Amino acid sequence: SIRRQRQMCIRDRIQVGQDAASSVYVNNKKKACAYIGIDSVSYELKEATTEAELVELIEKLNHTEKVHGILVQLPLPAHIDEDRIIRTISPDKDVDGFHPVNVGRLWLGETGFVSCTPAGIIQLLKYSGIEIAGKECVVIGRSNIVGKPMAALLLRENGTVTVAHSRTADLKEVTRRADILIAAVGQTKMITAEYIKEGAVVIDVGMHRDAQNHLCGDVDFEDVYSRASAITPVPGGVGPMTIAMLMNNCVQAARD
């Protein structure tokens, strides 16, 4: 238990409004904290909370010595500038790994907090014995949260990396070169077997509800399953690894 360490890791979670998906994620993170012995405090703020009020709360937590990690649940209401809020969090308490300082450290190969979903994917590949070095790695999606840090981490592991996106010409031609395909495109079951090279490793970052209200990802699992050598399911694939890496960042914040 973390409580047996010299310092107690207290992680503060801030949620503005009542976005249903955000509430599920916050609940899962709260359970994970309790399981490993991290003390966590939730701030559930009203939808009408102003940007200035949120900045003031974060600044207060930045200067609270016993708080080692601060997490602001995204997305935020439209009237709040997410970039400003992310920049307000102290880089040393930015356990999500979104602050520009930590993003810069990642690209420079320096030590810092790494965005949790990409970090979890790297650990998943390593644990599964999948070689990254020298492999053709294609990331579909260029978001600051998944796509860009994913590319940086794959480069760090000596993968040959291509980042595809909505403006990529002939996406299927690009993805069919991939030994490792990371789908973070944000479209329900978009990636079918025709996008996949025989024997490719497929990592599905998406999380959606299909027409039957079942959870599914960016990859059409049933269509791709027989073509891939390994594939992550939704749910139960990338999601748990994301939370595990968040817990790892929290522990690191307390130790540092």
Over which residues does each language-model region extend?
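Glycine-rich phosphate-binding loop
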Residues: 66-76, 80-84, 177-210
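Short beta-strand segments
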Residues: 15, 71-75, 140, 246
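Anion-binding alpha/beta catalytic cores of soluble intermediary-metabolism enzymes, centered on
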Residues: 72-132
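Rossmann-fold NAD(P)-binding glycine/threonine-rich loop
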Residues: 85-90, 94, 99, 103, ...
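Single conserved hydrophobic/aromatic residue that forms the stacking wall/gate
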Residues: 1-10
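Short beta-strand elements in bilobed, periplasmic/extracellular small-molecule ligand-binding domains
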Residues: 11, 33-47, 161-163
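Glycine-rich phosphate/diphosphate-binding loop of Rossmann-like nucleotide-binding domains
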Residues: 16-30, 112-201, 214-222
